Amino acid sequence: KYPELKILLTFFSPSGYEIRKNYAGADYIFYLPVDTPSNVKRFLDIAHPELVIFVKYEFWINYLSELKRRGIRSYLVSAIFRRDSVFFRSYGSMWRKALDAFDQMFVQSEESRELLHRIGFDNVIVAGDTRFDRVAAIARAAKPVDIVARFKGDAPLFVAGSTWGPDEDILLPLINANPKVRFVIAPHEIEESRI
């Protein structure tokens, strides 16, 4: 869509690089220089990025600090945060400050969003696991669940996951209008009053 823009794909680990070193979706592919202040400045001076995307666990403090200082937009995608990680510890202020560099964070779970919200970050969107290849592999490896197979029988099956009340209000007419379809609704929060 934007042929004048170039995509630069970097890796820190040899395993990631080896898998994607010939990836056709990027214009340039190479190793990310080690996260030292001088390396970061030199790399950014050469690359002149307009936008930077970090994936999952990529929290390079010097890169993030310099990107913020230069006003270069940065995003974090497919991130997962856990209660016991350094960001949520009393000694994690340096790491929390690094998160300030992100214009937007796309996390995999509501739990991650909640944890970040508790320490003052509202620029967080729950987007799930954006790695299509991983999602497809999980789907291919899925084992049939006997109780679901028996429930489904020969009927079409509609599954709605992580639903909220407003979602279920929309689904109700669909359910009533399709008596030959089986529905599985997995609410985001299970409340006895809604069962």
Put a short name on every predicted segment.
Residues 1-3, 140-195:
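Conserved catalytic-core segment of nucleotide-activated headgroup transferases in glycan assembly
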